[in-house]
Amino acid sequence: MQDFDFSFNPKACEGCGAKCCVGESGYIFLNIQEMQQISAFLKLELEEFSQKYVKKVGYKFSLLEKDAKELGLACVFLDLETKKCQIYSVRPKQCQTFPFWEGVKTFSKEQKEAFCQSCPGITQKTKETKVR
């Protein structure tokens, strides 16, 4: 994608063990439409889905996390045995657009290096290959 100084190979996701779905606590934000899509996919009423899988963070909604033992915390929809997303076809936009998040553009050099090292699909571009 343009304006990012890294590229992403989505094929790397197949063997990485869902590193983007586990680790330190974080937020997986979703909007009402995404909540409706996921609840329909799971064949749950929106209210039941919200009570079981969503927390409110200020004025936003986020998916809950679960204990992933030595991996830290995981998205509530990550199957810990297969390391696959149980709602992949209807996952939130935040998950669909990883790693191309606007906030990444403001990372310090050290943060960006750590971010790139955390995902086998991310490759930092050199100055010669940077796309504008």
UniProtKB/Swiss-Prot annotation:
UniProt-listed Pfam families: CxxCxxCC
Stored InterPro entries: Puta_zinc/iron-chelating_dom (IPR005358)
Sequence similarity: To M.jannaschii MJ0661.
Protein's name according to its UniProt entry: Uncharacterized protein HP_0274
Native source species: Helicobacter pylori (strain ATCC 700392 / 26695) (Campylobacter pylori)
